[in-house]
Amino acid sequence: MLGDRVRATRYFAYSGEVAIAALVVAVIGLMILPLPTPMIDTLLGINITLSVVLLMVTMYVPDSISLSSFPSLLLFTTLLRLSLNIASTKSILLHAEAGHIIESFGELVVGGNLVVGLVVFLIITTVQFIVIAKGSERVAEVGARFTLDAMPGKQMSIDADLRGGNLTADEARRKRARLAMESQLHGGMDGAMKFVKGDAIAGLVITMVNILAGIVVGVTYHGMTAGDAANRFAILSVGDAMVSQIASLLISVAAGVMITRVANENETRLSSLGLDIGRQLTSNARALMAASVLLACFAFVPGFPAVLFLLLAAAVGAGGYTIWRKQRDISGTDQRKLPSASRKGAKGEAPHIRKNAPDFASPLSMRLSPQLAALLDPARLDQAIESERRQLVELLGLPFPGIAIWQTESLQGMQYEVLIHDVPETRAELENTDDMQAALARQAISPLHARAHLFVGIQETQWMLEQVAVDYPGLVAEVNKAMPAQRIADVLRRLLEERIPVRNIKSILESLVVWGPKEKDLLMLTEYVRCDLGRYLAHTATAGTGQLPAVMLDHAVEQLIRQSIRATAAGNFLALPPEQANQLVEQVERIVGDHAQHPLAVVASMDVRRYVRRMIEARLTWLQVYSFQELGSEVQLQPIGRVVV
C-alpha cells in the first residue's frame, strides 16, 4: 500500500514537471505560430479549467504555506492568458473568426446590442481591476512588510524555545525553514499581484485595439461595410476579452482568497475556508436572531416582497434558535465540569464527577456515594477545590496533580473515600450542611499536604522546569546538563517528605547545579541542598524568633549511628539494632514530653541527620530534625536535653 502511494506521488510529481515544461513551450508557440480555431477552443477551455481548479484549491488549503508555488502559478497562468490573447487576436483579424467559445461568449454578452456588451465588459473589467486586483495587491504589500518585520522576533522566539528545551533541534530546524518559506511566499505574492493587475489593464487595451483594428481590417481587407465590420469584430473582440477576463477574474479571486486567509494554530489539514466561515458565522446565536428580527421588519416596508423577507427571517431565526439550543446544552454540560480538578498544565476537556471509575489510576482520587454525588453543587465544589489548590501552591509550591472523582455503589449514605494511587487513605461520612462542598474539597486535598512527596514524579518535575525556563532558561539548561530529571525529582521528593516547600525552586536548582556533579549519594546531595536553603529553614525552625529549643545528641550517639550506616547498591540505610534504636527514640520522647513547646526540634550533624529523622518519624511525626550546618550561626540553640547511649 505504501509503495503504491509513493509510486503515485512520484508519477504526479513527474507529470507536473512535464506539464510546466509543456506550458512554457506552449506560451512561446502561441505568441509566434498561427493556430486553428479548434486548438484555440481547446486552449481556452484548459485556461478556464486551470482558473477554476486554482480557485477551488485555494479554498481548501489550510494555510498559505501549503500552496507555496502560488506566485509562480500566477506568473504562468498570466502568461498563458496573454499568449492566448495574442493567438486569438491573430485569428480574429486574419480570418474574422476565433472558435466557438469566443463567438458564443461574444453573442451571449453582447446579446444583439453592442453598447450593452461593451458596458458589461467594462463593468467586469472595472470590478476586477479596481476592487479585486487592487485590494489583493494592497493586502499582499502589507502582508509582505509585516512578515519581514516580524521575522527577527519569530527567529528569536524559536531560539529561546530551543534553549529552554521546549523544542528539539529538528523541530527548531523545521520552524526556521517554515519561517523562511513564509517570508519568501509573501515576498513572491507581493510581486506576483502586479501580474494580476497588469493582466486586467492589458485585457482592456487589447479589446479596444481589437475592435478598432477589426473595423479597419474588415473594411479594408474583407470588403465589409463599417457597420458590419463593427458588429462582427466587436462580437469577437468582446467574446475574446470576456473569456480572458472570466479566467483572470477567477485567478484574481483565488489570489485574494490566498493572501487574505488567516490560519489559526488549531487548524488541521482538513480545515478549509468554507468550514472556517461557517463555524465563525454561526458561533453567535444572538446575532442570527437579531438579523432575523431585522429581516422581519423589512417585510413591512411598502413595496418590499413581504413573503420573501418573512421566509428569510424564519430561516435565519430557526438557525439561530438551533445554535442557541446546542450552546445551552454544551453550557449545561460545562457547568457540571470541574476545571479546578484538572492536573496543573493539563490540556483537553475539564474533568467532572464520573459515573464510573476511570480506566487508569490517578495520583489522587475520590469516590462518592450516589446520594452524596446527587447533593453536591458542581459549581461550588469547583470553587472550593480552586481555593484549596491556591493554598497548596502557596504553602508547598507543589503543582496540583489533579483529582478524579466518581460514584460507586460500594459507598452508602453520605460516605466518601479518598485514595492515593488507588490505595484508600481516608473514608468518612459527610454531613449535609451548607459548606459541605468546602469540607469535601478540604478532605480531598489534605493528603497533598501530608504526603506531598507521593505526588512528585518525572512529569511534574519536567513541568516545573518548563515554567522556570520561561524566566531562567540558562539555569534550567545548566541543571539539565548536571543531572537527569529523575534525579531532580528524587531530591524534590525528599524535601517535600520533610515538609520543606519547593516554592523556592530557583535556589534549589542553583544548588543542584553546584553539588550535583560532585555528590553522587542522593541523601548527601539532599543535605547540601538543605544547607543552601538554610536561611529559610532557620526562619521556619525558630518561627522568626532566632531561638530554638533543641534536643541534642551525644557525640557517642552520633558515632554509633555513623558506624551503623550500611552502603548497598540500592543506597545507604541504617542498620542499628532495634533495641538500641528503641532506647534512643524513648529518650527523645521523654525529653520532648517534659518540654511541650513550639518551636522544638532535634539537632544533629549533617551526615547523620537524615538517619535520625528516619528513626523517630514513625513515633514523632511532627518533630523536625535539623543539622548544625543548615541552621547556621544565626540560630541560638537552647538545649533542653541530651540523648546518650
UniProtKB/Swiss-Prot annotation:
Alphabetical keyword list: Cell inner membrane, Cell membrane, Hypersensitive response elicitation, Membrane, Protein transport, Transmembrane, Transmembrane helix, Transport
Stretches for region Disordered: 334-354
Which example biological process does GO assign this protein?
symbiont-mediated perturbation of host programmed cell death
- Pfam families tied to this protein: FHIPEP
Q: Does the keyword Cell inner membrane apply?
A: yes
Q: Which domain of life is it from?
A: Bacteria
Record-annotated membrane-spanning stretches: 18-34, 43-59, 108-124, 201-217, 243-259, 285-301, 308-324
Entry's localization field: Cell inner membrane
> Which cellular component terms (GO) are annotated to the entry?
plasma membrane
List the membrane topology term(s): Multi-pass membrane protein
- Record's family? Belongs to the FHIPEP (flagella/HR/invasion proteins export pore) family.
What this protein is called in its record is: Protein hrpC2
Species source reads: Xanthomonas euvesicatoria
